[in-house]
Regions:
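Short N-terminal binding/cap micro-motifs at the start of the first secondary-structure element
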Residues: 68-73
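Active-site-proximal loop/hinge segments that shape catalytic or ion-binding/gating pockets
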Residues: 2-32, 40, 48-52, 57-58, ...
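Short glycine-centered helix-capping/turn motifs at secondary-structure transition points
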Residues: 77-78
Length: 274
């Protein structure tokens, strides 16, 4: 319970940052729209529509159906993060060591060191077995990773992590922070100012990628806001840099409460081979 309370403080901290700079963030987003779409556009109206698209986008958690442990999932009745599992399925045992370092900087955890719940959110480093040294550390203090799938990708919002996915209920988005890039990648650059919350989606629009080739987040949002048809590029949701909007869930993800739909890819199913 105390770990989850620390996670809520992280969410509140990021939201406070966005609230503090909300006027600056909105002006930055408006300038970008004006610069890239033309001054003759009603930039404020377009921005409001883009925010609405993001707030109404579906939230997905991708997984590989051939690798996920459904028995364990049903046993716990909730989706667990890599700290609770000990590592990310299919990844190196030291995965959480790097993840902890990135999260500590990206979410400014050191600024919450005076919190009474801080001991439950600090790993204290890792043992040779790659387990947190701190006995008070709680895996619930750290987020569950998802994607904001505003383009309704055939395989969810981050198919590089598996072509199957859970679609979560809309209310879960209120418990999230969002990044225009994977926080592990160099594009994010451990820059906390790029993070947003449900109430401050303008920050995503101000910072999202605008690549010339492949999936283009900014131009896709502009087209959707204008009511134009958007073709989903094949590299949407792939890679670990800028091809999807990353979400960080600071709440439990209960199977029978928070998951709206389950999509299983036949490419990952054992039935497709029989």
């Amino acid at each position: 319970m105390y770990g989850r309370l620390f996670g809520k403080q992280v969410l509140a901290h990021i939201n406070s940052n966005c609230q503090r700079d909300s006027d600056i963030i909105r002006e930055k987003a408006l300038r970008r729209i004006s610069r890239e779409c033309g001054a003759e556009m009603d930039c404020a109206l377009l921005l409001n529509k883009m925010v609405d698209i993001l707030q109404n986008a579906r939230l997905t958690i991708n997984f590989n159906a051939a690798k996920i442990d459904f028995v364990s999932l049903l046993k716990h009745k909730e989706y667990l993060n890599s700290y609770a599992l000990g590592c990310r399925p299919g990844d190196l045992p030291a995965y959480n060591v790097g993840r902890d370092s990135v999260e500590t900087k990206a979410f400014e955890l050191e600024k919450l060191a005076d919190s009474p719940y801080a001991p439950y959110g600090q790993t204290g480093g890792f043992s040779l077995a790659y387990t947190p040294k701190s006995r008070t550390f709680s895996s619930a203090s750290r987020p569950i990773y998802a994607a904001l799938d505003f383009l309704l990708g055939e395989n969810g919002g981050a198919s590089s992590y598996g072509k199957s996915f859970f679609e979560l209920n809309d209310n879960v988005k209120i418990n999230c922070t969002f990044s225009p890039f994977d926080i592990y990648g160099h594009r994010f650059g451990l820059d906390t100012s790029k993070l947003s919350t449900f109430w401050h989606m303008e920050n995503l629009i101000a910072s999202c990628q605008n690549d010339f080739f492949g999936y283009n987040c900014f131009k896709s949002l502009v087209k959707m806001a204008k009511g134009e048809k958007v073709l989903v590029h094949s590299n949407y949701g792939t890679g670990y840099e800028g091809n999807y909007i990353e979400a960080h869930i600071y709440s439990d993800v209960c199977l029978f409460r928070d998951i709206k739909h389950v999509y299983l890819s036949l490419q990952e199913s054992s039935y497709s081979k029989s």
